[in-house]
From Swiss-Prot:
GO cellular component, as recorded: cytosolic large ribosomal subunit
GO molecular function, one term: structural constituent of ribosome
PANTHER family per the UniProt record, alphabetical: LARGE RIBOSOMAL SUBUNIT PROTEIN BL27M, RIBOSOMAL PROTEIN L27
Name by which UniProt lists this protein: Large ribosomal subunit protein bL27
GO-annotated biological processes: translation
Keyword match Ribosomal protein: yes
Disordered as annotated region, ranges: 1-22
Organism field: Shewanella oneidensis (strain ATCC 700550 / JCM 31522 / CIP 106686 / LMG 19005 / NCIMB 14063 / MR-1)
Family annotation (InterPro entries): Ribosomal_bL27 (IPR001684), Ribosomal_bL27_CS (IPR018261)
Keyword Magnesium: no
HAMAP family on file: Ribosomal_bL27
Keyword list, A-Z: Ribonucleoprotein, Ribosomal protein
NCBIfam families, alphabetized: L27
Entry similarity comment: Belongs to the bacterial ribosomal protein bL27 family.
Length: 84
């Protein structure tokens, strides 16, 4: 004979896995060609000189050098470049 009333199930209690987005290499850091600089959704950061952009908007180094963050243009867009 049960001495506790049966508990109803809940429909909550789930969450998606984190996607590990964000800046992976910061300003002034040395990078090798192919290194991922930023993982992002959309273009929060734009590709500058010697930086490529993947189909998921990931920015990566096209050449070896140092990472440089800069704000340019009338809309104050953030660009990431690689200086040799």
């Amino acid at each position: 004979m049960a001495h506790k009333k049966a508990g109803g199930s809940t429909r909550n209690g789930r969450d998606s896995e984190s996607k590990r987005l964000g800046v992976k290499r910061f300003g002034g850091e040395s990078v090798l060609a192919g290194n991922i600089i930023v993982r992002q959704r959309g273009t929060k950061f734009h590709a500058g000189v010697n930086v490529g952009i993947g189909r998921d908007h990931t920015l990566f180094a096209l050449t070896d050098g140092k990472v440089k963050f800069e704000v340019k243009g009338p809309n104050n867009r953030k660009f990431i470049s690689i200086e040799a």
